[in-house]
Every structure is written in C-alpha cells, then in structure tokens.
C-alpha cells in the first residue's frame, strides 16, 4: 500500500509541473536561475547544470554586493534562528494558487544541483499525503557538497559535527536519500535549528490544520561548498494557522568552520 501511494504521488508531480508552467506563463512570470521561487525540477533529480550558479539563494562574495537574507540575519549571536521580514514568508500569488490546487494530494519540487554540487531551493505543498508511511532508510551513500566525516565527542551531543540535513524533512515529504534535498549541516543546525520548525509543521498537519506551503533554501556565499544557513518559510493555506520566515544558522558552538571546504577546528 505504501509503495503504491508513493508511486501515485510521484506520478502526480508530473501533472503538477504542467499546471505550474501554465500558471507562470499566464502571469508572465520570469523565473531566473537565481530566484527562490518554484522551480519545476522533479525530472532532473541529480542533474548538474553547466552553470556554476546555484538555483537556490546564493550570496555574492564579500565586497561585490549585499544580499538581503544574510544582511537581515546578521552574525550568529547565540540564537539558532532569527526572523526574516518580520516572520512573513515571500510566497507569490502563483505559489499560493498552486497550493490551493494541490491542497489534498500535495506537491514537491527540488532544484537540481549546481555545477559545484550544491543544493538549491526546495518547495512543497505539504499535506498528510506527502508524509511517509514507512520507516526512513539509509542516506549514508549521499555526500553533499563540503561533506566531511568528523567528530568532537566532548563538544557535540551525537559526536559528529555534520549531519546530512534534509531541506524538507523526511517526516514531512517522504523524500529520503534525494541528493537534491540533502546539505552538509551541523548537528546544531539540524537539531536546534530545523527540527523545532519541522515538528511544528508536522503536528499542525497531523492535527487537521490542512495544507502548508513550505520552502527551504540553503544560503551559500560565493563558491563556498557549505551553506551559511537555511532560509525557511512556511504558511498554512487556512488563515490564522501556521506562518514563519526564519534564517537558521549553520554553525556549531565551540567549533570553527571553513565554509569554502567544510574543514573544521576547535575554537579557543
């Protein structure tokens, strides 16, 4: 039964892609490689475009131009998350229309990896139908950009510095070892940053709250292989439900990180 439901959901993604193209065309919406809007990428899982420009949010190197997400978030000061845009998501009218059209069966879209192997934006209309019906499998075969297997037993609960962090959690999407949905994230980002918001959305849907628009965008700087953090947005279709827009820091207290390579060291 679980496999049949999984295949059905995958087939419906193709029809959703067609619907989305029509909506975008009608609105004369131009979607560039650098936008954080919906990217219909279901058919290109694992594909690497020729361009090294990431499909998700990419921050220019220091001195070239200011990027609003990192500028708004500022430096890490001890909080795992900070509000962006007063907590108001940036979903477009077309994305909300898609959400209403897919409010029952759901929808998922994962941008292709860029030329450096980095993830882009992941967008979904989350419902009970997108949630998994079977236990999560192994993801150890996936090596996200900047990945290192390194441990600090005395500093980190769980010992290992890096986790394979799902942009859209398995418990929300049923997507497991999808390389377009996994980034190199610290244990702190995964547990203190992303998990509370993921559980909030999951509980909301399971308790009858209805469909939720959801987007997770890794934020890189220049050609760095490890994201500086994740921009996370959610909004329920029903008014008065769930809504947030936050930046989650990809840091680990007590550990220094070279975001260009993923190398790390103990801080004094």
Briefly describe each language-model feature range:
Residues 16-30:
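Hydrophobic membrane-insertion alpha-helices, especially the h-region
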Residues 100-268:
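Domain-level detector of nuclease and nuclease-like folds
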Residues 1-13:
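N-terminal Lys/Arg-rich, disordered targeting/topogenic segments
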Residues 10, 14-19, 35:
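Intrinsically disordered, low-complexity segments enriched in polar/charged small residues
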Residues 9, 44-45, 169:
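Intrinsic structural disorder/low-complexity segments
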Residues 33-97:
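N-terminal, intrinsically disordered, polar/charged segments of Gram-positive cell-envelope systems
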Residues 21-23, 72, 78, 87, ...:
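Glycine-centered flexibility motif
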